[in-house]
Amino acid sequence: MPVMPLLRTHKLTGLFFVKADIMESYTKPALTVAEQIAQWEKRGLIMPDPDRAKRYLEVISYYRLSAYTLPYQIPKSNNNEHTFIPGTNFTDILNLYIFDRKLRLLILDAIERIEVGVRSIINNHMALTYGPHWYLDQNNFRNKYDHKRLLEKVSELLRQKRKEVFIQHYLKKYDKPKFPPSWMMVEILSFGQLTLLCANNLHKQDQRKISQFFKIYPPVFLSWIRSLNYVRNICAHHSRIWNREMAQAPQLPKVIKDTWISYPIVVSDPKIKPESRLYLLLAIINFLVHQVNRSSSWHKRLYDLIENSTFSKAHMGMPENWFEDGFWRLP
């Protein structure tokens, strides 16, 4: 039977054309750790301590570490064998992996503070304005919102989290309403669910009141929390954050001196588009975390991590002297 082509439809200047890519069967075998090391050595990677490399590959995995080898390989157009740039050492790959891990953890630390703040601000406004069980009233949502679906989700989460002490207390002590007050409800929703609730379903006047706390307009705030949820999921699943092109571009505020990063963003590699890289998200995180905690030192910890490493800032969409921008409030 002939191999069926995979059809891709592209739009070009108002016309559509079809490109056929021939699909093939995956035939690569699984490799032992020793074979993985041998393959990298064959491609030119220096292994000063194979036993050390073996230990890391056993607990991190060849596939995960492979993503960190790409910057150290000869450019793809001239390199079908994934050959390493001469002089590349396994320690280079490992150090980049460790740096990326530290960066992810630093990002998660800030997002956790922002997320807790967002939960609290949403609950405080909605509960004080419409009552503790505001989310049970369909009138508090836009007409297009599937209110029944929200209640089904909360009901499902109550079953899943029934061993939580605060859920047990409510269900044992109260029979009406069936659902707990919103300060409990917002704690059992995931950040993604809470983001969807706020961004798509609350009335505009409520979105405006919630975003006022963070000193930005609702469209920008709602775009930012969606972007934070996106990058949070990347970090929480231990995926690479350095040298990543972001799938979701956040909406940008009007530039006001020292309250937002300077434009245009200029990086050392002209092929890189900063708007789709991490730097914008780091700026968003820094802005929001300082609304939650005015005395936060998160930006200083970011400075220490970035400036004590040797890895490309351009691959994060970051200017070489990013810290000189007044937005970062760094000496």
PLM features: residue spans?
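Long, contiguous internal "core" modules enriched in hydrophobic/ aromatic residues
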Residues: 3-331
